[in-house]
């Protein structure tokens, strides 16, 4: 293992193997402890995309909220559907929601807000690319979740995990923004393992991962966008050997996107060297 890989493995906290029952218990306890430590929290808010990550986090949150209520703590889980117009994988979103069984479902179509933002920028002489418009979608989705959380005395739960964090494969202040990120420390295959253990439909955790933000490239697989497979990323995070080409791609993503893993730099925190 190279020195940089060792540093990254330590930072990303991924275990070489996990016990599903123990891991789920730890994840639920983290969520519950956070809520119990902040008496103002009356709701937890999460956007549901129909993919592996939001399905897993949604199920964990609902299980945690159920236990909190049994312990006398008043708390609600709000699952949010955030389509941009008509969502191509809407059936999978509904399948995920049936599995999660959230207390409450809110649907907000982000298309009018995103299109107006893009148009307003265009009128100001700023013409966004399709990729940049995709980031607008991600930020609008997170803005809506924080608005709901503010209205309902809640917090926003994120879906960031270590296979995503290492590559910076998320929108800064978009899907990368949240109050808590329960599944950080898991890689992609471990997330699948937990969903299988929880009895999720195979379609939800065997689905090809995609951010699906670009109009010109609908359902673009994450692995195509990243230039490396999740299998390689997972192996790297577990301290296993990968090919030199895979190592270079992963480490380049890690270095280039370091700013996404930090709050705004100050003159005291900017790593100049």
UniProtKB/Swiss-Prot annotation:
Catalyzes the ATP-dependent amidation of deamido-NAD to form NAD. Uses ammonia as a nitrogen source. Homodimer. Mg(2+) binds at residues 53, 164. Deamido-NAD(+) binds at residues 139, 172, 179, 259-260. This is NH(3)-dependent NAD(+) synthetase. It catalyses: deamido-NAD(+) + NH4(+) + ATP = AMP + diphosphate + NAD(+) + H(+). ATP binds at residues 47-54, 159, 188, 210. The gene is nadE. Its EC number is 6.3.1.5. It comes from Staphylococcus aureus (strain NCTC 8325 / PS 47). Keywords: ATP-binding, Ligase, Magnesium, Metal-binding, NAD, Nucleotide-binding. GO terms for cellular component: cytoplasm. It is an enzyme of class 6 (ligase). Belongs to the NAD synthetase family. InterPro entries: NAD/GMP_synthase, NAD_synthase, NH(3)-dep_NAD(+)_synth, Rossmann-like_a/b/a_fold. It holds the Pfam family NAD_synthase. GO terms for biological process: NAD biosynthetic process. GO terms for molecular function: ATP binding; glutaminase activity; metal ion binding; NAD+ synthase (glutamine-hydrolyzing) activity; NAD+ synthase activity. Pathway: Cofactor biosynthesis; NAD(+) biosynthesis; NAD(+) from deamido-NAD(+) (ammonia route): step 1/1.
